[in-house]
Amino acid sequence: MASDPMSVNSSAREPPAPPGSGADEPKYGGYTRFELELEFVQALGNPLYLNHLASRKLLSNPAFIAYLDYLQYWSRPPYLKYITYPGPTLKNLELLQQEKFRQDIISPDLVERLRLEGMKAGIDWHRESFPSTA
């Protein structure tokens, strides 16, 4: 099943062409590989989703770990600009490269800490970007 965008062999593939590059990407269920991989990599910004992946034992699957390594292309231009929340998304993608983190994310305490850190970062960013006039 080498044509599957998330197959074991996907880690050896080149990243998909970004929109507007003129490349004619095949569709999988109506979506391009670019769209599917963008949706998935953005989901990695959610600590609860990472915990779900760990509970399903995906974070100990060598093929899945290779896929996470492959997805690091999202941290570089021209792909970076398409990520809605690059801070938590890329932080978690980087952390997922570490075996210890992949093991530890099963802990509800770590999930809650990451969730609270993300909320605090969002609040701090909002305060810096839109200071009150009072």
Curated annotation (Swiss-Prot):
A single GO cellular-component term on record: mediator complex
Which domain of life does the protein's organism represent? Eukaryota
Compartments where found: Nucleus
Biased composition of type Polar residues is found at: 1-12
InterPro entries, alphabetically? Med31_sf (IPR038089), Mediator_Med31 (IPR008831)
Q: Does the keyword Cell membrane apply?
A: no
User: Keywords on this record?
Assistant: Activator, Nucleus, Transcription, Transcription regulation
GO process annotations (BP) = regulation of transcription by RNA polymerase II
Question: A Pfam family matched by this chain, by name?
Answer: Med31
Q: Where is this region: Disordered?
A: 1-28
The molecular function GO annotations come to: transcription coregulator activity
Q: How does it assemble?
A: Component of the Mediator complex.
Family statement drawn from the similarity comment of this UniProt entry: Belongs to the Mediator complex subunit 31 family.
- Role, per record: Component of the Mediator complex, a coactivator involved in the regulated transcription of nearly all RNA polymerase II-dependent genes. Mediator functions as a bridge to convey information from gene-specific regulatory proteins to the basal RNA polymerase II transcription machinery. Mediator is recruited to promoters by direct interactions with regulatory proteins and serves as a scaffold for the assembly of a functional preinitiation complex with RNA polymerase II and the general transcription factors.
Protein name (record): Mediator of RNA polymerase II transcription subunit 31
The scientific name of the source species is Neurospora crassa (strain ATCC 24698 / 74-OR23-1A / CBS 708.71 / DSM 1257 / FGSC 987)
